[in-house]
Amino acid sequence: MDNLLISLLRKFEPETAHDISIKLLKFAPILFNKFRHELLEQEIVGLKFQNPVGMAAGYDKNAEVFESLFKIGFGFVECGTVTPLPQYGNPKPRVFRYIEESALINSLGFNNKGINSFLNGVQKRTDFDSPLGINIGPNKDTKNFIDDYTILINKAHDFADYITVNISSPNTENLRKLQDKTALEELISNLVASLKDKKVQKPIFIKI
């Protein structure tokens, strides 16, 4: 069945195939059974993972199917990257399939529906057995990267088990300049300061 599904999805343009898979995943609890074993369990930064295999950010960008991903067996799911405002991303085509190399290359550009729509999905969460991460990034036309990250981390904090600050995208002009030591220290210090009144401090990761 897996091979048949993959063959069918490959008949579509890659981004269309992704959108179809998101729709199909809403029926995942009917199609799959979750496997658990104590030998696979992990604990990292105080978070308990049922297994070390997770779904990275970039798949469930708008927090639509993370619970289905939990139900089919992922040990954690990281949703996003989400930006403060809705963003179309780069012009299409922007996802390229290389079957011979079993590779998929994307130049999406943080396409997503924005943090308010994103949180509507996250607030429906009922499965708290596996960690849910939220990956945050700035809008392409922002005037201030740090302001965008500060808005996002404060809105997302209470709904995430951990937060990933994405400063890796080559599709957002000058974003990677935040990887400079001085700029990164300023970013981190601002984010930490903005969360100082939170009763529970969530783990924060930096994606470089």
Task: State what each model feature region is.
Residues 1-208:
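Flavin-dependent oxidoreductase catalytic cores
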